[in-house]
Amino acid sequence: MKICFLDGIKIPYTSKDINSNKIRGAENILINLSSEFANLNHDVTIYNNCDNDEVINNVTWKNINSINDKPYYDLAISNNDIRLLDNVISSNKVAISHSIQSLEKFFRKKQFISYLKNKPKIVTLGNYHDKNRNYLIKIFGSFKINWAVDQIFIDTEIKLNNNSCNAIFTSHSDRNLDLLIDIWKKYIFPKNINKKLYITPYNKSLEQFNIHNRKFEDKKNLLNDLSNSRVLLIPGHK
C-alpha cells in the first residue's frame, strides 16, 4: 500500500528526533506508526515541515509545501488537522485526534468544511477520548488505538532510588499542572515538607512549597530524572 502522513506543525522534525525534547506525543505517534507501516513493507511518505527531503529507515520525509497535483495514496492519515487531507487523493482518509474536541472548537479551527469534504474516519486515543468525543464529529466512522510506549523506555532498565522523596511531573503545563500544584500545596506538602515536586517550567516561584522547575530535556535525561524520583504524578481531567 501507498500510505502518507500529513502534519502541519511548524517544528521541523524527522524520525531522527524521536528522543528529542522538541517534539510532543502527537509527533511521536506519527514517527512510530510510520515506522511500523514501513516494517510491514508498505510505501510510506510523511509530509511535514522537515528541512530536507530524505529517506530514513524506508520512510520518505518530504516538506509539506512540496505537495502538488494532489498525489494519490491508498491511505492518507492527518495528524490532528483535517484540512491537510484536501491536498491528497485517497479513498481511505483518517484523522488522528489527540484531544476531546468540542463542536465549537471544531468550527473555530476551521475543520468542519474539510471534514464534510474528506469524510475521514477519526482515530481516538483510548476509551476516554472515544467515549467523550462528540458523536457528530464521528459520523463517518471512528476507531480507537491505545497509547503505546517509545522503544527507549522498553529497552532501558531504570534503577529506582527507593530512598528518594521526589515526585515528578513531565507533561506540559496545560495538562492540569495547576490542579496538581493546588493538590500538592493543600494536601501533600503540609504532611511532609521534605518531599519535593519537580515540574515543567512554571511562571511562578513555588520553592517555598518544595516545588522546583525542571527543563524539558531529551528522553535520555528524562529517564535519569525518573530514576531519581519515587513517583510520577499525572493529574486527570477536571
Residue ranges and their predicted role:
Residues 7, 46-48, 77, 146, ...:
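Short beta-strand segments
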Residues 151-223:
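Conserved catalytic-core segment of nucleotide-activated headgroup transferases in glycan assembly
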Residues 1-48:
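N-terminal subdomain of nucleotide-sugar transferases
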Residues 5-11, 97-100, 147, 199-204, ...:
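Short loop/turn segments at strand-loop or loop-helix junctions that form parts
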